[in-house]
């Protein structure tokens, strides 16, 4: 005797299909939220914080907003990376290491300005050595990824090595003179912002620039800016001098022009992820 057919709600294949569709909807919603938060962070909050660098109270407010938003973007982006990619692939390892390296810059920068604002001459504590160890471990991860392949990863590993050399030299010297802490703050915060611009470049300049160039141009430009700001802040009496204003102005100008292009790119209502780099959609600007 033939049994009665299963109701749709009891069919395992349909239950699994509905569950998958529900998960996909949540995934897409998180991507949308990630994008809605990401673009203002890159093109409004961060430039506003840079422009307010000579007004400590205002700069601090925008800086806190940048820290909180970037933390949100890192957490959601990391979740999307783990949820949307095969964990055994090189691309997955690259994304995890690269994104943590970029995000961690804001932590080092925040620690530096916290010490800079203290009365007297701060000295490195156990936390500072732990952060230095974290930076070293992250750079080691970049070196492992870069050893497999990829010119941009090799450049980022080189940048990381330079940061490590500066890090341990400044720790050895006990953050003296105190202006070192201001240099550390500008170095790391700017590095975090150029990381953000790198992610946006990967997403929106996939067809306009060669594959390696879209990854590295923010680092090349950022290296010049960071070198200029570091030189401007070498003396405690001149942490916000003319050269620093020029470097910050150039960075904001690039951000404004870049924001205009991104707005145009989004308005075209077509996929903007470069071929072969869809994995980067899980970061600041997912698609």
Predicted regions and their residues:
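Short, Lys/Arg-enriched N-terminal segments with co-localized hydrophobic residues
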Residues: 4-22
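Alpha-helical membrane insertion/targeting regions
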Residues: 17-287
């Amino acid at each position: 005797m033939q049994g009665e057919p299963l109701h749709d709600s009891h069919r395992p294949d349909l239950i699994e299909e509905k569950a998958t569709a529900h998960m996909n909807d949540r995934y897409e919603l998180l991507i949308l939220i990630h994008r809605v938060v990401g673009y203002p962070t890159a093109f409004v909050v961060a430039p506003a914080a840079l422009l307010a660098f000579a007004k400590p109270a205002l700069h601090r407010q925008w800086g806190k907003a940048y820290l909180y938003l970037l933390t949100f973007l890192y957490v959601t982006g990391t979740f999307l990376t783990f949820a949307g990619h095969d964990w055994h692939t090189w691309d997955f390892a690259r994304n995890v290491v690269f994104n943590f390296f970029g995000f961690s810059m804001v932590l080092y920068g925040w620690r530096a300005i916290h010490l800079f604002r203290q009365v007297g001459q701060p000295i490195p504590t156990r936390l500072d050595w732990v952060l230095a160890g974290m930076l070293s471990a992250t750079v080691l991860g970049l070196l492992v990824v870069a050893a497999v392949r990829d010119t941009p990863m090799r450049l980022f590993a080189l940048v990381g090595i330079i940061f490590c050399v500066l890090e341990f030299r400044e720790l050895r010297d006990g953050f003296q003179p105190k202006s070192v802490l201001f240099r550390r703050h500008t170095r790391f915060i700017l590095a975090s912002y150029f990381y953000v611009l790198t992610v946006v470049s990967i997403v929106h300049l996939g067809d306009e620039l060669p594959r390696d160039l879209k990854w590295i141009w923010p680092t090349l430009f950022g290296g010049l800016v960071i070198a200029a700001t570091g030189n401007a802040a070498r003396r405690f009496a001149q942490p916000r001098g003319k050269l620093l204003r020029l470097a910050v102005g150039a960075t904001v100008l690039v951000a404004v022009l870049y924001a205009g292009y991104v707005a145009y790119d989004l308005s075209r209502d077509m996929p903007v992820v470069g071929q072969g780099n869809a994995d980067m959609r899980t970061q600041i600007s997912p698609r």
